[in-house]
Amino acid sequence: MKRVEVADSLRGFSLIGIFLANLLIFQFGLSGQEYISYFHLNPVNYSVGILINIIFVHSFLPIFAILFGFSMDKLYQSMKTKNIKRPKLKLFRRSLGLLTLGFLHAIFIWEGDILTSYAIAMLILIPFISFKIKFFKWVTIIGFILLSLLFIGSFFDSTNTEPSSHEKATYVSEVTQIYAHGSFHEIQNIDNKVKDPGLEMIKKDLGDSYGLLLLFSIFINFPLFTLGIYFSKSNWFEKNAKQFWSCKLFIYMIPIALIGKSIMYWSNHNNSTDGISFLSGTLLSIGIICLFKKVYQSHRQNWIMQNLKYMGKMSLTMYIMQSIIGTLIFYSYGLGLFGKDILLSVSYTHLR
């Protein structure tokens, strides 16, 4: 089965966005990315951090999740076309391999792993992968409706979800000390040494269980995986990007999504702003996919698109390499630049 090149190019593009989003985590920590004002950055780097947060954080990982579901179905279709026996079993083996790699990545390389949750989602989806397109269409619609209701409910909850200034300052000081000067063992066990105020807030709602947190992460991403499968079964990427309801509408909504994502910077931080920001991030992801599809259909032979395509074909390798490079730049067992005022220079170097 012929590869869908626009999907490969989009995957490469999403990897760049993911690296820029993860750059904040590499440099400031999982919750520290939201407290960059406590790192005393110069005005230019601080502004770059805010822009990365609005445009890339929680906007490009959903694209990667959609493409993961898309690729999973394409792989299944390819095996069926080639009359390969027990294709679901082969998908199951691949998911176990990805799960193992995800565990190793999370334990020995970087705590911000996404491979583990992707592998678990794949295990859940395998029994249904042979179902018709209508199944995935309605699962996706119902999934997004449930998520919307979940976060719309937060609009009526004005509870403050922002940790205190003292909690933020303490967290920033402790993680900087460990990531910039601690041993490899201390970095790998930082969750046992430092209380992440953002994670503590989530634990209050979901309970002190990492398994439950992982399942919640899979739940909020599940409609993205099924949307990707729907895109595959409907040949969505091959269709004209000028169609209004399936593409152009979401491009027009990109500015609205950006305003929604920026709400945390011009409004009080509470459950309602968290909900608006999350839903806006998902909307922005779909808008970016549609915009990229439109640009690709007009400039598919452009050298940028071709290079993104090659990057997308090596997405797993590129993702692991990003983690290795990011930790070696910022953690103490590398250059130890965690928390330093160099955000703009690293972003510029990567984009080059």
Residue ranges and their predicted role:
Residues 1-66:
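N-terminal signal-anchor module of multipass membrane proteins
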Residues 3-9, 249-254, 296-325, 343-345:
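Functional transmembrane helices that form membrane-embedded active or gating regions
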Residues 248-296:
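Alpha-helical transmembrane segments and terminal signal-anchor/GPI-anchor hydrophobic tails
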Residues 142-223:
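Long hydrophobic alpha-helical segments that form multi-pass transmembrane helix bundles
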Residues 62-74, 116-129, 216-240, 280-299, ...:
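Specific transmembrane alpha-helix
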Residues 80-89, 129-135, 234-245, 299-306:
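Membrane-interface helix-boundary motifs at transmembrane edges
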